[in-house]
């Protein structure tokens, strides 16, 4: 992706382009992790999956959950895309199709005919993570 025209997608805000599972040996840990610290810290945020086709606001982008897991004095990291119908449709077509709240784009008829998401308002699922009914939701 060429993101040079998008200042909100530079540096620390640049998108992560792959899902990763990192063991403790692959992470930089400073100090010691308490053995009784058990659980996970999760963060959901905007992460564009395809080359933007319009101005990008800092909160535009598909959801990606980053998680750090703690157990028995050890730590690991995982990140995963939030599998929305909009992201699945764009993956199927291999390109950006939908706009954003600030710039709605008409969904191409070919996308609708192929069973893609017809709603032009992208569900980014990039704001929060909640555990409900035995499932992790974004």
Question: Can you name each region flagged by the protein language model?
Answer:
Residues 1-138:
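Beta-propeller domains
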